[in-house]
Amino acid sequence: MSVSVHETRKSRSSTGSMNVTLFHKASHPDCVLAHLNTLRKHCMFTDVTLWAGDRAFPCHRAVLAASSRYFEAMFSHGLRESRDDTVNFQDNLHPEVLELLLDFAYSSRIAINEENAESLLEAGDMLQFHDVRDAAAEFLEKNLFPSNCLGMMLLSDAHQCRRLYEFSWRMCLVHFETVRQSEDFNSLSKDTLLDLISSDELETEDERVVFEAILQWVKHDLEPRKVHLPELLRSVRLALLPSDCLQEAVSSEALLMADERTKLIMDEALRCKTRILQNDGVVTSPCARPRKAGHTLLILGGQTFMCDKIYQVDHKAKEIIPKADLPSPRKEFSASAIGCKVYVTGGRGSENGVSKDVWVYDTVHEEWSKAAPMLIARFGHGSAELENCLYVVGGHTSLAGVFPASPSVSLKQVEKYDPGANKWMMVAPLRDGVSNAAVVSAKLKLFVFGGTSIHRDMVSKVQCYDPSENRWTIKAECPQPWRYTAAAVLGSQIFIMGGDTEFTAASAYRFDCETNQWTRIGDMTAKRMSCHALASGNKLYVVGGYFGTQRCKTLDCYDPTSDTWNCITTVPYSLIPTAFVSTWKHLPA
């Protein structure tokens, strides 16, 4: 039943007032479109014929141009097709797919299924039926499997379907062992293969899977591909291969010894392996860097806000296990990991004094040591590892000559620590001093989100530090002013969650540090202020925090592929998390 609306209005003119009725029939557009479709099927008033294969489709130029920018440009910019009464796609377009697109143009409806989804995505992109392309991509997202995710990744990359690409990419990383057995794997470009195997988020319990995958790819088309082997080998964590596997590869794999560059790479891997087996200090070579799925998750916390213990998260048993005591209990410090070591910087001790101290926990030998103190005593600061160095950012220090100790305004000063030299140095200061900000490293840069300003206001800026230029820039504005948030990194995506207001406490966002664009993701399961987050494999983990008088007692996990949060385990009631870090696991023999 059609619905119409009559509105009576008064309009004043030179002759006085008069009544005007505005009539609106909501179903009119559908009726017109339906009748145009009837006219098309009877070839009435059609003025162009589209050909695909051996089939002809009479159409109306106006309907095509209104439905697709492709046809609008074709018919209005003086192209040959704007004058001809036929457009021939020949064999570039399947007739059944073109028929579906035309039915959509004349009805606004289309049936997408497993058999036509890929073809509709390709044709929708080619003919700029972007709504159809996006609908097909959404259908394919819901039908992603390890067996088809590589093909979907390549398809979505070719047709600018970013969301489908991200989901497919994540699934390729999670199921790499299955992906390498697919037909598409051996046809990958070198650059795409390199992107996959160089990712810290690639999930495999055995680096031999990656090593064997690149040899498989090179041997599939040996002559043109063997030149790429050195570059590919540099992205394999060769020092994480078992010793016997590494030795056997060097002695029996002729392909590895055929090029001087590959020989040097394998020699370096053997040297790193020897150092690892001899416990000869921290091995920071890229060939010895574990992927994130091979990291150990550690929580620093205590029974009060004064942290006095390290706990280890056992993924499989879903338990949180006490690991070691802190030599000097403290609060409002920051903690970051470099390799197998945890660096605890600054904070306030039991006497409320602000500390310059840096305590280092070696997870291999399970012992504490002191590193060189920071140049400025600080608390409420952030820290992050970048290129095997530690950066501490912002925070507060104590005001000189004030007793008892009183906090300063938010600091601009940023310090860099070199573990090899055991030395601190100042680098370029923040554009805006902040405390209680979220600090992470991604894509060889530091990012600082929000925080408390020198005027004690919440900050909404994203500050970015480029170490190659020793310079800070403002990259973007946050969706809202933030402080007491947590941040974690997956590839080029930085995830921000929590905060100290009713509107931010449960919210979570994704920031693309290559495009500087924000995306809202699913809310957390609870409101969290001062929570802590990190990435492991292709998932995010968040722990701790509170809101009002309610403490958050769960360790939750976020899966980006499904945009869902789930509880992993309950944090012991006596534990109040103060920091959350991931370190390298003990490296295999």
Curated annotation (Swiss-Prot):
Q: To which pathway does this protein belong?
A: Protein modification; protein ubiquitination
Task: Describe the location of the BTB domain by residue ranges.
Answer: 46-114
Q: Which GO terms describe its cellular component?
A: Cul3-RING ubiquitin ligase complex; cytoplasm; cytosol
What is a single molecular function from GO for this protein? ubiquitin-like ligase-substrate adaptor activity
**Signal peptide annotation:** none
The stretches annotated as Kelch repeats are 296-340, 341-388, 389-444, 446-492, 494-538, 539-585
CDD domains registered for this protein in UniProt: BACK_KLHL25_ENC2, BTB_POZ_KLHL25
- Which GO biological process entries does UniProt record here? negative regulation of fatty acid biosynthetic process; positive regulation of CD4-positive, CD25-positive, alpha-beta regulatory T cell differentiation; positive regulation of fatty acid oxidation; protein ubiquitination; regulation of translational initiation; ubiquitin-dependent protein catabolic process
Q: Which InterPro entries match?
A: BACK, Beta-prop_ATRN-MKLN-like, BTB-kelch_protein, BTB/POZ_dom, Kelch-typ_b-propeller, Kelch_1, KLHL25_BTB_POZ_dom, SKP1/BTB/POZ_sf
Per UniProt, the keywords (alphabetical) are: Kelch repeat, Repeat, Translation regulation, Ubl conjugation pathway
Keyword Isomerase on entry: no
Q: Tell me where in this chain the BACK domain is found.
A: 149-250
Tell me the PROSITE patterns matching this sequence. BTB
Stated role: Substrate-specific adapter of a BCR (BTB-CUL3-RBX1) E3 ubiquitin ligase complex involved in various processes, such as translation homeostasis and lipid synthesis. The BCR(KLHL25) ubiquitin ligase complex acts by mediating ubiquitination of hypophosphorylated EIF4EBP1 (4E-BP1): ubiquitination and subsequent degradation of hypophosphorylated EIF4EBP1 (4E-BP1) probably serves as a homeostatic mechanism to maintain translation and prevent eIF4E inhibition when eIF4E levels are low. The BCR(KLHL25) complex does not target EIF4EBP1 (4E-BP1) when it is hyperphosphorylated or associated with eIF4E.
Query: Assembly and partners?
Result: Component of the BCR(KLHL25) E3 ubiquitin ligase complex, at least composed of CUL3, KLHL25 and RBX1.
Tell me the protein's name: Kelch-like protein 25
